[in-house]
Amino acid sequence: MGKTFLKESFSPSPFQRINKMNGLVFDIKEFAVHDGEGIRTTVFLKGCPLCCAWCHNPEGLSSKKELYLKQNGCLGCGLCRVPCDHDECKDLGRCLHVCPKNLVSVAGVEWESEELAEKLLTHKDFFNTMGGGITLSGGEPLLQAEFCVELLTLLKCQVHTAIETSGYAKQEDFIKVIRLCDFVYMDIKLADSEQHKKYTGMDNKIILENAEYLKHSGIPHTFRTPLIPNITDTQENLTAIEKLVGESSWEKLPYNSLAGAKYASVGRRYRLI
C-alpha cells in the first residue's frame, strides 16, 4: 500500500503568482505500482460525473469536501454527530475533533497547482532513474480539467506523466489534457449505452467519442475494463468492447471485492450488495 501525504506535512511553495489555480485532491500516494509504468506517485482528484455501482473510491465521487468517518474501531458513541462552532467544522455539520479515537477526517484538500507540482517534483530524480512518474487519477481528473492542464504544464518535460480517466468529459477538455500526458489509461466499462446508464448513471456517447479520438491521436494509451461479475464481464460486453478498442492496447482489471468497505465512511450505500 502506498504512503498517503497530508498537505499539512509539506511546506508551502515559495513561488507567488497573482492567478493561482486550485484543485481539490482527496489522496496522494507514492510508491504506487498499479497506476502506470514503474513506481509512481498518484494524485487522486476529487469529484466524478459518473456514479459506478462498483466504484472503489467513493470518497472521490463528490466534488466537495466531506467528512470521512473510519468505521474500523468506531465506538458508536455518537459524539461526532453533534454540530460544533469550530470554523473548520461548521460547513461539515459535525465536529472533527471530538472523536475519542480520532477516526474523523476530511476527504478533500485544496492544493495550488505550483505548490503541488513542487511537492511532486521532489521525487523527480528517483522517477527518472527508476522509470516511474506521476499519475493523475480520481474520481475523474477531467472534472478539474483546467487544474490538470496547469499542473501537467508544470510537470511537462521533467517527469513522465499519465492519467487515468473514464473519458466522460467535453472533448475540448479531454483533448487539451491528454495532449499534455505521456500516457493515457481510459476506461471502457460497458459498450451498450443503456447498460452504461443503468450502472454508472450516464450513457456512454461522450466516452465512445473520446475513445475514438484517443485511438487515432498518436498518444500512447491503454483502454481498461473492470471485470464486474455479471455486469461488465459478460461475453457479449467484452466482445463489443474488443471491437471498439480495435488495435489499441486493452487491459481487463479484476474486480475489487473490498471496495464496499469504504462506503459507510462517507455516508453512501454500496449498490452491489
Summary of predicted features, one role per range:
Residues 72-82, 93-130, 134-135:
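Glycine/small-residue-rich loop that forms an oxyanion/phosphate-binding "nest" at active or ligand-binding sites
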Residues 264-272:
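Short glycine/proline- and charge-enriched loop/turn segments
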Residues 22-47, 53, 58:
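N-terminal cysteine/histidine-rich coordination modules
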Residues 42-55, 68-102, 140:
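Cysteine-centered iron-sulfur cluster-binding motifs in ferredoxin-type domains/subunits
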Residues 2-9:
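Targeting/processing segments of secretory and organellar proteins
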Residues 114-117, 121-265:
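Conserved AdoMet/S-adenosylmethionine-binding subsite of the radical SAM
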Residues 57-67, 105-108:
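Iron-sulfur (Fe-S) cluster-binding segments and ferredoxin-like electron-carrier domains
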